[in-house]
Amino acid sequence: MHELSLVSSILDIIEDYAAQDGFRRVNNLRLSCGRLSGVDLQCLRFAFEVLSRETRSEGATLEIDFLPIVISCLNCGEDTEVEYVEASCPECGSENVLLAGGTEELRLLELDVD
């Protein structure tokens, strides 16, 4: 369950920001996560609930934006959002494609603090 280490890292980042900016409490945090990252949403929420106890993030609302899977065609230049990884370009049919998005693991985007 790598979600524990991901949440631990996010909480460390929050503590670093708190040391710099002097805030006492996190009300809300927004993360982004690629659809192909392998992060389990339920496990992530559970890990956050457990690991944030007795920290300035305890009770904070956790929002997660999922980033779409995007393939980029090297022939026609189109970047296309897809539901699953495709081996060919939906626009021109070329198999000369690269995975261009959706693999990002986890990123802290926004904090609402007091």
Curated annotation (Swiss-Prot):
GO BP, sorted A to Z: protein maturation; protein modification process
Positions bound to Zn(2+): C73, C76, C89, C92
Keyword Zinc: yes
Molecular-function annotations in GO: nickel cation binding; zinc ion binding
Keyword Metal-binding recorded: yes
InterPro entries on file: Hydgase_Ni_incorp_HypA/HybF_CS (IPR020538), HypA/HybF (IPR000688)
Binding site for Ni(2+): H2
One family name in Pfam for this protein: HypA
UniProt feature coiled coil, ranges: none
Taxonomic superkingdom: Bacteria
Keywords (A to Z) from UniProt: Metal-binding, Nickel, Zinc
Family: Belongs to the HypA/HybF family.
Function: Involved in the maturation of [NiFe] hydrogenases. Required for nickel insertion into the metal center of the hydrogenase.
Protein name from the UniProt record: Hydrogenase maturation factor HypA
Organism listed in the record: Syntrophus aciditrophicus (strain SB)
High-level lineage: Bacteria, Pseudomonadati, Thermodesulfobacteriota, Syntrophia, Syntrophales
